[in-house]
């Protein structure tokens, strides 16, 4: 852990002195691409020389099964031809892959096109995007070079530029910021940046957090039918941004309650133990300035959702 911290700190200092962020990103991407291209041909040649039709399905399985198969066929080339076609290794990966990838994807891909209302298309597309979570990172803030300032986060030598909006603009000054967590959702921007996100910056945990907040859901569909549901929302942070709360809750509602299918209005209300509350309006995306707001995750009491 100390070596990783030293490496990231040295990289942070390099960014502060040079400011050449684009070049670093291109170099990191170039090294990543070249490394993956070299590894791919190494796994295929030894298997295709012995048995062309049977080595291809085994290429996706662990390399240990590839070594054992050619040794058995080399000892008995004529009689045990059936042993090669019916080993347990060929039967094992097929059911595993079908249950992991096909089962969860098939119901969603079949239902989504028939149930999505066109006016909710953009909201559903945004809240089903993949998200990233970086913890205990180093954030670097350089001098302002455009209309907005950025915190540069460098996990695994890829640079993510986090727009400092709302309260973050005054909260974080220029320099190096340690022990930073960032919740990232890549967004379109006017700065030609590939890895760009807004808000979602919090302080790293000082202790382990395992908190669950109850979620009560009331949904009225386009036919007037009202249904009720109860679930939980897991919180593992002392500090959590409204960006992360809003995104994860809506994504959970899309997956379990078909939010932005045929209905997409209503609100989410976060109720705190001290009596406070925070509201997300479902008919529109969370405002950018609120994406920087941070609350005490352990102080969340319960969550109420009304969809209509």
From Swiss-Prot:
Keywords: Secreted, Signal, Virulence
Domain of life, per lineage: Bacteria
Biased composition range(s): Low complexity: 77-93
Pfam families from the UniProt entry: SSL_OB (PF09199), Stap_Strp_tox_C (PF02876)
Biased composition annotated in UniProt, kind: Polar residues: 33-47, 55-76, 94-114
GO cellular component, one term: extracellular region
Chief location bin: secreted
Compartments (UniProt record): Secreted
Region of interest: Sialyl Lewis X-binding: 180-278
InterPro entries linked: Enterotoxin, SSL_OB, Staph/Strept_toxin_CS, Staph_exotoxin, SuperAg_toxin_C, Superantigen_bac, Toxin_b-grasp_Staph/Strep
Classification via SUPFAM superfamilies: Bacterial enterotoxins, Superantigen toxins, C-terminal domain
Region (Disordered), start-end ranges: 32-117
Signal peptide positions on this chain: 1-30
UniProt xrefs under PROSITE patterns: STAPH_STREP_TOXIN_2
Family as reported in the entry's similarity comment: Belongs to the staphylococcal/streptococcal toxin family.
Notes concerning its domains: The C-terminal domain contains a V-shape binding site for sialyl Lewis X.
Role summary: Secreted protein that plays a role in immune innate response inhibition by interfering with host TLR2-mediated pathway.
Record protein name field: Staphylococcal superantigen-like 4
UniProt organism field: Staphylococcus aureus (strain NCTC 8325 / PS 47)
